[in-house]
């Protein structure tokens, strides 16, 4: 999965897919009352990027629905996964559950079209801090209680906090998410800094272990082709990048293409790939 990083303006959906992304990452800014408001990252962000592009969240989700709905004039069949990076800086911990419900309501209405012929992309909720696990609980509860339980098949979960994997595992348990139940484990740092592959390799080992909790692993934000190659060889399922075309170039390498290819819609993002 090639995850186009920081796609927060509607026009960027096409821009990043044109560069080769089959997934995008979008930042979702919440108000202090736990309402999803904008697609916005803000300062600081990755080097060589403009940090302040934004859209109203409802309008963005509607545009995203069109981009992922077969038959729509805006449909992009390549776009199969969307990572929602949830910005919770202004949300009180006590409001995390309600924030999850609010996000679920907006996705049902503006992306899934009330469960009728909505967007087909898989949705990965990326929560920045483990202690906000109740956001996941609230999200899941809304879908189950309001008659949309079937949509949970399209939803996965990630805690992006740079902490012990055991702590993240506890967070999923507290959220009511079972081991290997649509879980991605992320690792990484801004492209402004260098990072070793130590934690990525630990996450890959956990994924491949019979008693591990995750299904997939992605690495962010990787822009150098040498770093992309290293991450893929280390076992990453997804590469989050500002330059999807560079990942495409890496996948053309004779040695890489013997073992890896670009994910397609029929490739289940919640299932661990076995060599």
UniProtKB/Swiss-Prot annotation:
Mg(2+) binds at residues 25, 27, 85. InterPro entries: PLC-like_Pdiesterase_TIM-brl (IPR017946). Expressed by the venom gland. It is found in: Secreted. Disulfide bonds join 45-51, 47-192. It comes from the Eukaryota. Belongs to the arthropod phospholipase D family. Class II subfamily. This is Dermonecrotic toxin LhSicTox-alphaVI1ii. The lineage of its organism: Eukaryota, Metazoa, Ecdysozoa, Arthropoda, Chelicerata.
């Amino acid at each position: 999965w090639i995850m186009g990083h920081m796609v927060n303006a509607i026009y960027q959906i096409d821009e990043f897919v044109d560069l080769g992304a089959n997934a995008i990452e979008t930042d979702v800014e919440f108000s202090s009352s736990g309402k999803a408001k904008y697609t916005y990252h803000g300062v600081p962000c990755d080097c060589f990027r403009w940090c302040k592009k934004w859209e109203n969240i409802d309008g963005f989700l509607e545009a995203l629905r069109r981009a992922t709905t077969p038959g729509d004039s805006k449909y992009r069949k390549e776009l199969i996964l969307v990572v929602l990076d949830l910005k919770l800086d202004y949300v009180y911990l006590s409001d995390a559950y309600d924030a999850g419900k609010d996000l679920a309501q907006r996705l049902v209405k503006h992306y899934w079209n009330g469960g009728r012929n909505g967007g087909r992309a898989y949705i990965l909720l990326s929560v920045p801090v483990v202690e906000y696990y109740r956001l996941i609980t609230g999200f899941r509860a809304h879908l189950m209680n309001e008659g949309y339980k079937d949509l949970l098949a399209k939803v996965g979960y990630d805690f992006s906090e740079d902490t012990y994997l055991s702590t993240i595992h506890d967070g999923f348990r507290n959220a009511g998410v079972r081991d290997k139940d649509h879980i991605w484990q992320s690792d990484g740092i801004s492209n402004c800094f260098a990072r070793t592959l130590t934690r990525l390799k630990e996450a890959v080992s956990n994924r491949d272990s019979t008693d591990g909790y995750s299904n997939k692993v992605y690495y962010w934000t990787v822009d150098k082709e040498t770093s992309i190659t290293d991450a893929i060889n280390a076992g990453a399922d997804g590469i989050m990048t500002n330059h999807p075309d560079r990942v495409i170039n890496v996948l053309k390498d004779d040695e890489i293409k013997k073992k890896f290819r670009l994910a397609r819609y029929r490739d289940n993002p919640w299932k661990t790939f076995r060599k």
